[in-house]
């Protein structure tokens, strides 16, 4: 078999496997709709106002069950985002309802209010305590949920995603999940204490519908709807999972610019160096 035929056969195998994988992916749950995000694409940046609203939703709704182990109060005043005033973050940490464990000057264990350098404390003493409260289940930590929970778009969309640089599967899934609660179809049995969600794999989820219209009060005039809440908290969780996204993209463009200029200089140097040699050989 020639190299060309092997290449064609390999492409056919890849596309065939991709096409065959679509039903398996779709059977786990409906495909979420794509949302519009300020941080999408190569030029995208976080919307600081949206991140603040998202943290507000997390603080008032999500934190009652979920943790944010990798999240720290010190990250909130970050110049990248959400860029909160330092004094406000200090007050926020001091008023946080869960205290942190520490050691006093005498070496005895104590509890105190969180400070700016601290991580956002967990409301559970340990995993066993979380299981007791939630009937044997442990609510997932949300630190990297926007990157860990996602969905596959299947063929041919993964091909176009290479060029559009679509990488927001996780936040699209979060928005879909928070808005996917509905009555189950006929003859679909949902166990007591569980709920039907068309976007959750298997469609049976143990989490109570967490948000509803008017649940959180915004102070900037943003619509206080379930869909808006879900978008805002999804954006915040994306920032929690990738807080340096803004910086990474800005540095990336500087690097690409440097490579373009450096490549041009190399080409020009090659022309200048080899032009006399070529003339001498002519």
From Swiss-Prot:
Q: Does the keyword Plastid apply?
A: no
Its source organism is: Blastochloris viridis (Rhodopseudomonas viridis)
Q: Any S-S bridges, and between which cysteines? A: none
Tell me which domain of life the UniProt entry assigns to the organism this sequence originates from.
Bacteria
Q: What is this protein called in UniProt?
A: Cytochrome c1
Q: Which gene encodes it?
A: petC
Instruction: Look up and give the membrane topology term.
Output: Single-pass membrane protein
Q: Where does heme c bind?
A: 62, 65-66, 207
**Major localisation:** membrane
The keyword Heme belongs to this UniProt entry's keyword annotation: yes
State the Gene3D superfamilies in the record. Cytochrome c-like domain, Cytochrome c1, transmembrane anchor, C-terminal
What job does this protein perform? Component of the ubiquinol-cytochrome c reductase complex (complex III or cytochrome b-c1 complex), which is a respiratory chain that generates an electrochemical potential coupled to ATP synthesis. c1 functions as an electron donor to cytochrome c.
């Amino acid at each position: 078999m020639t190299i060309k035929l092997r290449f064609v056969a390999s492409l056919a195998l890849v596309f065939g496997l991709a096409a065959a994988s679509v039903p398996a992916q779709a059977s786990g749950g409906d495909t979420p709709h794509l949302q519009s995000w300020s941080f999408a694409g190569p030029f995208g940046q976080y919307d600081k106002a949206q991140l603040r609203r998202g943290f507000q939703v997390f603080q008032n709704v999500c934190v009652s069950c979920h943790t944010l182990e990798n999240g720290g109060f010190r990250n909130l005043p970050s110049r990248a985002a959400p860029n909160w005033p330092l004094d406000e973050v200090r007050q926020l940490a001091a008023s946080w309802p869960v205290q942190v464990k520490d050691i006093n000057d005498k070496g005895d264990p104590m509890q105190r209010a969180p400070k700016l350098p601290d991580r956002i404390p967990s409301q559970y003493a340990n995993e066993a305590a979380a299981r007791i409260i939630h009937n044997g289940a442990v609510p997932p930590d949300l630190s990297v949920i926007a990157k860990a929970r996602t969905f596959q778009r299947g063929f041919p969309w993964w091909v176009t995603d290479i060029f559009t640089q679509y990488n927001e599967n996780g936040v699209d899934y979060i928005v879909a999940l928070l808005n996917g609660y509905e009555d189950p179809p006929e003859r679909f049995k949902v166990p007591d204490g569980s709920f039907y969600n068309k976007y959750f794999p298997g469609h049976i989820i143990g989490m109570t519908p967490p948000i509803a219209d008017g649940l959180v009060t915004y102070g900037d005039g943003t619509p206080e709807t379930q869909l808006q809440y879900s978008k805002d908290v999804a954006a915040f969780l994306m920032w929690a999972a990738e807080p340096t996204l803004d910086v990474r993209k800005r540095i990336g463009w500087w690097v690409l610019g440097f490579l373009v200029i450096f490549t041009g200089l190399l080409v020009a140097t090659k022309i200048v160096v080899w032009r006399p040699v070529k003339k001498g050989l002519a």
